[in-house]
Amino acid sequence: MQVSTAALAVLLCTMALCNQVLSAPLAADTPTACCFSYTSRQIPQNFIADYFETSSQCSKPSVIFLTKRGRQVCADPSEEWVQKYVSDLELSA
């Protein structure tokens, strides 16, 4: 009786651990940042330190500018000023 109780306890613990591992999202499949709206005005270019594009899994394609103060600003990639900033950042890299 004691052996079957111990075996059952081990089995339940193993199932609980496996369930947590299987239910955890995979890092590569989870977008790190998505934008749901864009900035309504152009940011001064000298405020921008870097940029990255959002994942294709996001509902809205976006460029996220990183400011020198550490803020993230969502911008519309179809805007001319956004394309110019991205191009300038690529050239300076």
From Swiss-Prot:
SMART domains: SCY. One of its GO terms (biological process) is antimicrobial humoral immune response mediated by antimicrobial peptide. Residues 1-23 form the signal peptide. The record marks 25-26 as: Cleavage. SUPFAM superfamilies: Interleukin 8-like chemokines. The N-terminal processed forms LD78-beta(3-70) and LD78-beta(5-70) are produced by proteolytic cleavage after secretion from peripheral blood monocytes. The cleavage to yield LD78-beta(3-70) is probably achieved by DPP4. It comes from the Eukaryota. Keywords: Chemotaxis, Cytokine, Disulfide bond, Secreted, Signal. Disulfide bonds join 34-58, 35-74. Its main location: secreted. InterPro entries: Chemokine_b/g/d (IPR039809), Chemokine_CC_CS (IPR000827), Chemokine_IL8-like_dom (IPR001811), Interleukin_8-like_sf (IPR036048). Pfam families: IL8. PROSITE patterns: SMALL_CYTOKINES_CC. GO terms for cellular component: extracellular region; extracellular space. It is found in: Secreted. One of its GO terms (molecular function) is CCR chemokine receptor binding. PANTHER family: C-C MOTIF CHEMOKINE 3-LIKE 1 (PTHR12015:SF151), SMALL INDUCIBLE CYTOKINE A (PTHR12015). Belongs to the intercrine beta (chemokine CC) family. Chemotactic for lymphocytes and monocytes. Is a ligand for CCR1, CCR3 and CCR5. Is an inhibitor of HIV-1-infection. The processed form LD78-beta(3-70) shows a 20-fold to 30-fold higher chemotactic activity and is a very potent inhibitor of HIV-1-infection. LD78-beta(3-70) is also a ligand for CCR1, CCR3 and CCR5. This is C-C motif chemokine 3-like 1. It comes from Homo sapiens (Human). The lineage of its organism: Eukaryota, Metazoa, Chordata, Craniata, Vertebrata. The gene is CCL3L1.
